């Protein structure tokens, strides 16, 4: 069983961001293999990724096309705006009992987060955040991922999580919902959690994307990130 991390990017700015994210994986999980699917391989320095796979027909959600192509038996997909700050081996152990794992979407009261595709789904089954996805290679998951790619193309939503929610709801994959420390979406959470509540494992902040105009927020973020660097 080979476990590994996959990044998928379209566009050179996001590819550069993925390089920074991958370095954080290397620092905290040196034994993990890391692959990149991208359309800007020339922007990638040597020594960061184990393998680079070129995307021939990139688009803003190339992720959904490439997830089924992972060579790993157990895959952790990460967005490019992520920093890994702890050992992740226990995540892969989840796949001994479950097929697919993700955290709930955080902004669950937004209209786009509650968007309906084809079927009404209970509010108590919210969207899953697509930036941290853990899955095992099996027929059920491969079918789910291929259906997700097709549905994103057909449905016309700007966000890919709308169709994922319904597909998972209708699927018989064994789903595990990751606790929030495995997908910390906002720096403010780090200010209110005490040491007995949770220890962040994966930081998933928009401010880690250089492609975003977020310079005004990066100084306080650096201070928070420094908590994990010793």
Q: What are these regions, as identified by a protein language model?
A:
Residues 1-230:
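Glycosyltransferase catalytic domains, chiefly GT-A lineage
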């Amino acid at each position: 069983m080979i476990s590994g991390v996959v990044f998928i990017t379209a566009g050179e700015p996001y590819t550069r961001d993925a390089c920074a994210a991958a370095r954080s994986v290397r620092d905290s999980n040196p034994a993990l293999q890391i692959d990149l699917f991208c359309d800007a391989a020339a922007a990638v320095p040597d020594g960061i990724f184990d393998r680079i796979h070129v995307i021939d027909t990139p688009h803003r959600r190339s992720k959904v096309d490439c997830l089924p192509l992972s060579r790993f038996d157990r895959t952790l997909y990460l967005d490019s705006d992520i920093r890994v700050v702890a050992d992740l081996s226990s995540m892969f152990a989840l796949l001994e009992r479950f097929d697919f794992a993700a955290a709930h979407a955080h902004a669950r009261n937004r209209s786009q987060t509650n968007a309906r595709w084809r079927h009404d789904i209970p509010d108590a089954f919210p969207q899953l955040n697509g930036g941290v996805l853990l899955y095992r290679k099996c027929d059920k998951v491969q079918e789910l991922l291929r259906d997700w790619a097709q549905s994103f193309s057909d449905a016309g939503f700007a966000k890919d999580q709308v169709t994922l929610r319904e597909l998972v709801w209708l699927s018989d994959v064994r789903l595990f919902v990751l606790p929030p420390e495995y997908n910390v979406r906002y720096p403010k959470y780090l200010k209110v959690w005490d040491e007995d509540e949770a220890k962040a494992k994966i930081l998933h902040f928009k401010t880690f994307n250089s492609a975003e105009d977020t310079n005004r927020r990066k100084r306080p973020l650096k201070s928070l990130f420094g908590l994990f660097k010793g």
